[in-house]
């Protein structure tokens, strides 16, 4: 003979209400906002309570206490006005039998006086879980006396053992066999888990199930995702096997701006100086020129070494010379557009002209090096500092420091604060005296 299921009667801890609004909220929750039926006690002929009468019933309950003062702040109220009890049945129990047995038990314990008094109560039968259960909300104020409902182990009528035994007797009459034995009688000595611990475990299990479902969705086949369903087109790039030629190359002119040239194997990166090479097609296709960074070693020894490094980089099979020349022309065009046209009278200042002249003589110095000439211009460029990596054309050319210095000294006279007369103006007094001495023969060499 299988073991019988135990009677489960639970008094919800903290389920009592202390204010009028709390009673209304509790009844609306049990009725699921009017979707479920609330049934009154046997004293009221077990009639259902309409949802629009919940407020009226709640106010009548607080008035039955005789001590409820509506002017008192809710946070100062300490007296619990109701008690919330749940009667549960095993899963698979007939809903009709469970409802009838639980309603009869509530009338026997709180409406007949067998429990030591008569009380008003409301019930709500829920079947949203596997096990059917009945919610009982009891007005703790006794109808025929001045006492309050109290359920405890030491109460002569309303103790936990009496509640379970009465429930087992009534359930048996409705065809539900339940056992009302104690835990010690069943050989269970450890302390049971609390309701809070049970609900915590229940939430953790539900969370774990959700996480497992999310993992299954992430590990679903790629065909279910719209991004994976699109085919990958490898036609714009052609790969050849062997050596540094494995780099993807564009097969049409439209995709040249999307190719990022990598650093060739023959180019070292000791000094960390960057040479920027821009593709001409990128300048024509996009408003912003996309530049590819090539690491090169341009030391501070001489400009000839720097030129040799750049030429060795241009000779690599990964970077065609046509792309380098196109980048050089693009850079010179960009510099010419950046220069602002000036007339003869209102030219730029001395410092700006020195900078512009230094850039302009760069190609001439580079051309001199290619011809094999070794003049003072080349020697001075060899001792100059390496150009910054952000400049595109200064990495492969040397600046003419001597001509820039000479030009600066020539311009110092113009920028000097001492006023000078124009060519067509009158001569100064000192000049006139010098001219007169030279005419009289007095302006000879002085010893």
Curated annotation (Swiss-Prot):
Pfam families: Relaxase. The keyword Nuclease applies. Residues 251-260 have a biased composition (Polar residues). Keywords: Crown gall tumor, Endonuclease, Hydrolase, Nuclease, Plasmid. Its EC number is 3.1.-.-. Residues 427-447 have a biased composition (Basic and acidic residues). Residues 390-406 have a biased composition (Low complexity). GO terms for molecular function: DNA binding; DNA endonuclease activity. Residues 214-265, 300-447 are annotated as: Disordered. One of its GO terms (biological process) is symbiont-mediated induction of tumor or growth in host. InterPro entries: Endonuclease_MobA/VirD2, VirD2. The keyword Nuclease applies. It is an enzyme of class 3 (hydrolase). Tumor formation by A.tumefaciens involves the transfer and integration of a defined segment (T-DNA) of Ti plasmid DNA into the plant nuclear genome. The virD operon encodes a site-specific endonuclease that cleaves at a unique site within both 24 bp direct repeats flanking the T-DNA. This is T-DNA border endonuclease VirD2. It comes from Agrobacterium fabrum (strain C58 / ATCC 33970) (Agrobacterium tumefaciens (strain C58)).
């Amino acid at each position: 003979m299988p073991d019988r299921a135990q009677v489960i009667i639970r008094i919800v801890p903290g389920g009592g209400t202390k204010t009028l609004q709390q009673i209304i909220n509790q009844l609306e929750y049990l009725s699921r906002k009017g979707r479920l039926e609330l049934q009154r006690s046997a004293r009221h002929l077990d009639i259902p309570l309409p949802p629009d009468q919940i407020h009226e019933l709640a106010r009548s309950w607080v008035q039955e206490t005789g001590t409820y003062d509506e002017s008192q702040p809710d946070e100062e109220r300490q007296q619990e006005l109701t008690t919330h009890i749940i009667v549960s049945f095993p899963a698979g129990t007939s809903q009709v039998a469970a409802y009838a047995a639980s309603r009869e038990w509530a009338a026997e314990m709180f409406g007949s006086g067998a429990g030591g008094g008569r009380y008003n109560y409301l019930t709500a039968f829920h079947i949203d879980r596997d096990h059917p259960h009945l919610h009982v909300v009891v007005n703790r104020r006794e109808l025929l006396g001045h006492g309050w409902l109290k359920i405890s182990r030491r109460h002569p009528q309303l103790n936990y053992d009496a509640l379970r035994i009465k429930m087992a007797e009534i359930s048996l009459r409705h065809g539900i066999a339940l056992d009302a034995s104690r835990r010690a009688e069943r050989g269970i000595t450890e302390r049971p888990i609390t309701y809070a611990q049970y609900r915590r475990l229940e939430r953790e299990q539900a969370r774990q199930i959700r996480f497992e479902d999310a993992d299954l969705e992430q590990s679903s086949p790629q065909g279910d995702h719209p991004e994976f369903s699109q085919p990958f087109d490898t036609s714009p790039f052609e790969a050849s096997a062997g050596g540094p030629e494995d780099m993807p190359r564009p097969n049409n002119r439209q995709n040249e701006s999307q190719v990022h040239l990598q650093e060739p194997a023959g180019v070292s990166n000791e000094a960390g100086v960057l040479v920027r090479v821009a593709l001409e097609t990128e300048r024509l296709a996009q408003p912003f020129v996309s530049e590819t960074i090539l690491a090169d070693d341009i030391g501070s020894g001489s400009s000839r070494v720097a030129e040799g490094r750049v030429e060795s980089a241009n000779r690599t099979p990964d970077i065609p010379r046509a792309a380098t020349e196109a980048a050089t022309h693009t850079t010179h065009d960009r510099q010419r557009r950046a220069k602002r046209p000036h007339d003869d009278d209102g030219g730029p200042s001395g410092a700006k002209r020195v900078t512009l002249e230094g850039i302009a003589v760069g190609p001439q110095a580079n051309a001199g090096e290619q011809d094999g000439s070794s003049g003072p211009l080349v020697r001075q460029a060899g001792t100059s500092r390496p150009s910054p990596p952000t400049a595109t054309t200064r990495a492969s050319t040397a600046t003419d420091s001597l001509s820039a210095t000479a030009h600066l000294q020539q311009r110092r006279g113009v920028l000097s604060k001492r006023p000078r007369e124009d060519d067509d103006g009158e001569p100064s007094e000192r000049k006139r005296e010098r001219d007169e001495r030279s005419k009289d023969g007095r302006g000879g060499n002085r010893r």
